[in-house]
Amino acid sequence: MPTTAATEVSPDNLEQYRRELTGYCYRMLGSGFEADDAVQETMLRAWRAADGFEGRSSVRSWLYRIATNICLDMLRGRQRRALPIDLGPASPPVEALLGDWSPDDIWISPISDAKIVPEHGDPAEIAVARDTIRLAFVTALQHLPARQRATLIMCEVLKMPAAEAADTLGTSVAAVNSALQRARATLAALPEEQRPASVDADQSELLAKYVDAFQRYDMDQLITLLHDDALMTMPPYSFWVRGAGDIVRWMQEPSPSACRNSIMVPVGQVNGSPAWAQYKPDPAGGHQPWALQVNEVSAGRISRMTFFLETERIFPAFGLPPHLG
């Protein structure tokens, strides 16, 4: 006979936690695909263990304990995920230096805001949810040991009291405070390009100009929209470029350029930033997938451009068509 507490662990009751658990697992794992798997496993384990839930903690805390254990198991013995700027210096904009694709399991992968950010609620909480899935923030988190990462997310992002975080992690309040202090110090010591930067809230006019210039292949206009020290990465390549001039030279370098005559399809918010599906001309006709573009804006210009090129995995995950006629 299920206990009164166990009746709280119904599928409908568990489902209300899916978004925030997805956000937690994504920040822990750095992969939208793995976050989905981890949350699904969390729900399954919770449902199977429902009869044993005694209500000594809230359902939410119990779910976070399960999700944390799953994430720690998934991270054990694994190389941290990264973006190209973590792995080496910027390259000159020369196609011959592009190199080969690296395995997909070393890269941060994108995720739609719709899977994590609440549709309604406190605007401040929505802003925190969005800011803490930005690519730079999620990448910075991967520099932390897994338990420090969990501690920082619980205390800084989810605003859990230290006692609740300690209970969830199965440790003491003193250990939580110590881990939090070490995690903050690690993030503060990262090189500037690897640290999260503040982003502009009102981006619409600038980004509309960017899409227009990109689709017209107007590099003279596009360079005026980029920050002088803008960064461009293209996972799964380790290659990356720094500076507006080098970015534009790169877009003009490959022959034929994948940027020329592209079509940009809005995708909505991805990792807290506006994103587009870029389709390049298909020699057989129409346009074929080329990249998911995620751009960040700071100080009135585009400061980071990430082109996710693994379209065979990413486009289906975002419900994007495999071809434009």
Model-inferred region functions:
Residues 21, 35-46, 63-67, 136, ...:
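Short, small-hydrophobic-rich alpha-helical interface motif
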Residues 33, 51-53, 65, 88:
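Hydrophobic alpha-helical bundles that form the membrane domains of multi-pass transporters
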Residues 68-86, 94-101, 189:
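Arg/Lys-rich amphipathic alpha helix in sigma70-family domain 2
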Residues 31, 41-59, 73-82, 142, ...:
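Sigma70-family region 2
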Residues 19, 30, 44, 56, ...:
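C-terminal and inter-domain tail/linker signature
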Residues 1-23, 33-36, 47:
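A short, charge-rich alpha-helical start-of-domain segment used by transcription regulators
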Residues 85-125:
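Charged, low-cysteine interdomain linkers and short loop/connector segments
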